[in-house]
Design a protein with these regions (language model features):
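Surface-exposed extracellular loop regions of Gram-negative outer-membrane beta-barrel proteins
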Residues: 1-30, 45-48, 52-76, 160-167, ...
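Outer-membrane beta-barrel proteins
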Residues: 17-23, 38-40, 73-79, 93, ...
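Structural signature of outer-membrane beta-barrel channels/translocons
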Residues: 24, 34-42, 90-96, 144-148, ...
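Residues that define the transmembrane beta-barrel architecture of outer-membrane proteins
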Residues: 25-29, 81-85, 99, 133-139, ...
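Outer-membrane beta-barrel "beta-signal"
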Residues: 30-34, 88, 218-230
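Gram-negative outer-membrane beta-barrel transporters
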Residues: 45-56, 73-165, 194, 205
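C-terminal structured "cap/appendage" subdomains that terminate the fold
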Residues: 178-199
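Gly/Thr-rich phosphate-binding loop signature of adenosyl cofactor/nucleotide-binding cores
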Residues: 201-203
């Protein structure tokens, strides 16, 4: 049995806080398998992990949109059942001594259902519906190459469809989305000063998507970062 008290912000933060929040209680069951080894000089690192879990949560503390969708508030969700599978993997290749290629990724399938006893007086039951803003399927991945001259990387993030409110009905549905980014960076050392320069292209494909309903994310953008250490 796990116990989580609401934080100070959960209780009292302006407009968001809810001083009537109850502590969250959970029973968690988990089984997992991990494999990791150094295979050879060319494949110095290989790792894979699979976890399956089942959680039964009472008075789950969640952030929930109010009538004004720009303002969210904390609330308790009476009873939630969460079950799912997480899979992660990573490997490194070293074709030459000074060059390393890295890959990693993860996949999550999660059913997080509101199993609170339905209110007979309400015609808006959310019983056995996926809780708000929780996709059943999500994934991410990264690939990168490290060289003495420059470091290059690519990353992506995928989220399946979600629902903006507790009812899983078409008008509350948010479409799935994917986000891709690339970056390049290099370190320069002059005497005792190390300078790091990196350039990133975010939302590479310039996709229109929303993480929160009615709040579109920025389109393609470029960000440059310069760090000096001495």
């Amino acid at each position: 049995m796990l116990f989580r008290s609401p934080s100070f912000n959960d209780l009292y933060y302006q407009e968001v806080g809810n001083s009537k929040l109850k502590p969250e209680n959970a029973r968690q069951y988990n089984i997992g398998l991990t494999y990791s080894r150094n295979v050879c000089t060319f494949l110095p690192y290989l790792s894979a992990t699979v976890d399956a879990y089942y959680n039964k949560v009472t008075d789950k503390i969640i952030a929930y949109p109010t009538k004004n969708l720009a303002v969210w508030s904390m609330r308790n969700l009476g009873s939630v059942e969460i079950k799912g599978i997480d899979a992660t993997g990573s490997l490194s290749l070293q074709p030459w001594e000074s060059i390393r290629i890295n890959f990693s990724g993860n996949y999550t399938y999660q059913r997080a259902l509101d199993v609170t006893t339905p209110d007979a007086s309400s015609n808006k039951s959310t019983y056995k519906h996926q809780i708000a803003y929780t996709p059943r399927v999500s994934a991410s991945g990264q690939a990168g190459i490290e060289t003495p001259w420059i470091d290059l990387s690519y990353s992506f993030l995928f989220s399946g469809k979600r629902y903006a409110l507790g009812q899983n009905i078409p008008e509350n549905r948010l479409a799935s989305y994917s986000d891709h980014s690339i970056s390049a960076g290099r370190d320069f050392r002059i005497r005792k000063v190390t300078t790091s320069l990196s350039v990133e292209v975010l939302n590479l494909l310039d996709k229109n998507y929303e993480i929160v309903q009615f709040f579109p994310m920025p389109g393609r953008s470029v960000r440059a970062t310069l760090k000096i250490r001495y």
